[in-house]
Amino acid sequence: MMRLSFFIILISSYSLSLLADDTAVTLENHLAPEPLTAGEQLRSQFSYPAATRAADHAAMNWQQSHSCITCHTNGFYLIGRARSGSQAPAYLEARNFAHEFIKPHVDPDHQRKGTRTPGAEAMVATTAFLAISDMKIEGALSETTRQAFDYIWRIQSDSGAWEKWIKCNWGPYESDDHFGVSLVALALGVASRDEYTQSPQAAEADQRLKKFLRSHPPESLHQKGMLLWAAGYRNDLVKKNVVKKWQDELFSVQKLNGGWVLPELGDKNWKRSDGK
């Protein structure tokens, strides 16, 4: 459910004119999003191919214009596009970019002098996105992703969170400690078939994650949704009697078109600059 909502968010910034061509989207031919307007044309029926092309365009545009990994564009794209995009040029480019983004900071054989390591939020989230993508595409964690996990365990605090995580009220990614913890808990659940997750360092880090979640129960609907997602891959995060309660809470704010309004899932800090 949350995967679908993130996917809808990704595609909503594109008009239909971007989606008529069947040519594969690449870093070289992608189109930037057009301005949102109240009068933009809407489809009469949902089109999955159009949605995937819009996601490809969005991911490639963000990669080229910002050269980083973020939750609202190419980060969750690595998860949401995996099932249908394992051979899509844009998806393969995004996976390669994510590996190259993180490798110099976690692989001693590829370190670059003078390169500043990205902030905790970038390293942690990219590790989680890559881990889930690796499992969906390859069925196992890559060596770079394993090294990235080892890195984020070293900067994880005893509380279980990453206390240097930037918080500038840009929910859900840069708003609180809960997002990073639940995202990594999800990634470990998805990767549970990989032997790395049973290693001492991963097991100890996972205990810290669970300690944080016990002492910081979810408050917003988004936090509950993230844990419901993780609970689909592991049974040690949410009690069975709580799952139905949280599901009902999320469905109670679902709109008639099947989606959700993102600010309604967060706290007061998720409002736009105009207060809406």
Predicted regions and their residues:
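Bacterial N-terminal signal peptides
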Residues: 5-17
